[in-house]
Regions:
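Glyoxalase I/VOC metalloenzyme domain signal
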Residues: 1-121
Length: 121
């Protein structure tokens, strides 16, 4: 029906955190890229570490909380506090946070909070 070898999969349905998805097998002609990514919002450093460790296993770390899993799919592992730190009306605080996270691969929540407060790492 889909012109692929018998037994191959054309679509897969899955659910993440209550959100339903359908993935289409585009074959070798369509590769994953950063235009499509999943964001995982984490409350704690432990959650950041958990998802980072598991998703980079067989994959690759990227800058600023980005990574690719072993299938080449892009993910962003983001502390929920980041928005609050970046949207502070005090521009100096948000600039320090931005400067700090631009140097990170995996987000370090304690380091972001120190930057926000103007404390040295």
């Amino acid at each position: 029906m889909h012109g692929r070898p018998a037994g191959s999969v054309m679509t897969v349905e899955f659910e993440l955190d209550g959100q339903k998805f359908v993935a289409l097998n585009g074959g070798p002609h369509f590769k994953f890229n950063e235009a499509v990514s999943f964001q995982v919002h984490c409350e704690t450093q432990e959650e950041i570490d958990y998802f980072w460790t598991r998703l980079t296993d067989g994959g690759a770390e990227g800058p600023c909380g980005w990574l690719k899993d072993k299938y080449g799919l892009s993910w962003q592992i983001v502390p929920t506090a980041l928005a609050e730190l970046l949207l502070d009306p005090d521009a100096k605080k948000s600039q320090r946070v931005t400067k700090a996270f631009l140097q990170m691969k995996k987000f370090d929540l304690a380091a972001l909070r120190r930057a926000y407060q103007g404390q040295n790492p």
